Curated annotation (Swiss-Prot):
Annotated Pfam families: Transferase
Family to which the UniProt record says this protein belongs: Belongs to the fumigaclavine B O-acetyltransferase family.
Keyword Acyltransferase carried by entry: yes
Protein name, entry field: O-acetyltransferase PC-16
Region forming the signal peptide: none
Transferase recorded as keyword: yes
Known EC number: 2.3.1.-
Task performed by this protein: O-acetyltransferase; part of the gene cluster that mediates the biosynthesis of the indole diterpenes penitrems. The geranylgeranyl diphosphate (GGPP) synthase penG catalyzes the first step in penitrem biosynthesis via conversion of farnesyl pyrophosphate and isopentyl pyrophosphate into geranylgeranyl pyrophosphate (GGPP). Condensation of indole-3-glycerol phosphate with GGPP by the prenyl transferase penC then forms 3-geranylgeranylindole (3-GGI).
Species name: Penicillium crustosum (Blue mold fungus)
PANTHER family reported in the protein's UniProt record: O-ACYLTRANSFERASE AUSQ, TRICHOTHECENE 3-O-ACETYLTRANSFERASE
First-level EC class: transferase
Subunit organization: Monomer.
Amino acid sequence: MSKPLFEAYPLTGLDHTIPPCYVRFFLTFPVPDVALAVNQPQKGADNFIEKLPFLAGYLAPCETPGVRPGQLEIRPPAEEGIPVCLVAHHSNSCLADSSATSTTEQLGTANENYLPVPFFPELDKPVPIFRVKVNAMTDGIILGFAFHHSVIDATGIGTIVRDFARCCRGPDGGPLEISLESQNDSREKLRHCGGPPDPRFDHNKEYPLVASLPADLEGMKQVLIQTARLMSTQYFRIPASLVNALKETCNHMLRESPALKDEGENPWISSNDLVVSLLWLCLNRVRYPAENNNVIPPSDSSVCMAVNIRGRMKSPINPGYVGNAIVLLRESVGMSAFLHKLGDGDPLGAQCYETAKRLGRETWEAALVRIALAIRRKLNTINDSYVRSVISYLEGVPDLSTVAFGQTDYHISSWRDIGVYEADFGGHMGHPSDMRVPDGMVDGMFYILPRRQGTHPCWEIHVTIHQDTMKRLIADPVWARYTAGKTPSLCRDE
């Protein structure tokens, strides 16, 4: 019997907080000679797995005696020679055929041909944690990627893509960012915190304990697919110059707020805070329009974001760690702020409104500052103590299959800094020209797409919401002032 590729190892508690699904996207590469280029990623994949064999692994229930119920592990493939890299030839299709979003009627099926696995993994047998599909088109290459999200987070995805590209370059690719030793060391740091949960934090809201996944998962899938028929997916872009100008306006209002100064705070917001808040603000404006008396808005609105903790601990997690080094930021803001009724039982909103009025700014700008500052303040609480408390809480969960996401109105994943466009595949391929995400299936799911190289920078956002809400969002005067409902190709240099 041959020696396994690697020894099986258990997932961390943070890995178990992620629902079972694949993160999927594809990268496009216009190339003059497809026949030559198609061999490059195939050879690169073999080199890649030889150096990092755990990426050929499968996710399955842990079989070690005495482990907690629900504990999952990564184990080597049961059979040798199962390819991580698949190849498909599309002799009658070009890159342009793949670039249009399929929107509601086709439920993203236009993209499925270029992706290696479906969105939902099977739960009754071991499933691969990483797959790539090489699609040979008439005028280029499409690389379809799939990563099991219970094993790999967005930062890890970017690292894997860059290292995969290095292996595609062959001997000249240079050293990898991922090392087997750092993976083991980082998992150990995330597995043990050295103390009880901090009583200041209520982790039940972020990670409530529910019943294990029901046996009728197929029924759940069908419900989600039917619901997806009512959704619309759209790409938007915001020029970075407009983001920077609006951020400076908001930070100026914060610096000029006497009340915030009196509290001894030195408030500021980042570009990411601002983009998330602008989307959050405009979505609630169009979901609960003032002229529609038939829609009664809730008392508040909530958002959930994943926060990279690699640099937030006193003993930092290695930046090349590819597992889930994320905790959830969950923040709620009173609906009065979104509907420009600042001051209704909201002292912070009243402060922002008074400062904006004194500076001659618009009411929606005051609301934006109020919302962005709430996000920034919550982000500032996610430090070493908070992360260790989360880890300790998860260590005490009796059955890891019961850990779930708390409910929120919007889920936003920022891939802005994962570095996908920095990946250089060399040879006949070079850098990717575009990244595409399949149409979304869930109302209120958004991705801030990776930063591009070039002289015309912008923020790209992949938005999935109800069809009627999408129409109103596109027409919203604030959103339209900063965005264009165009494909992200407009953000790159022509």
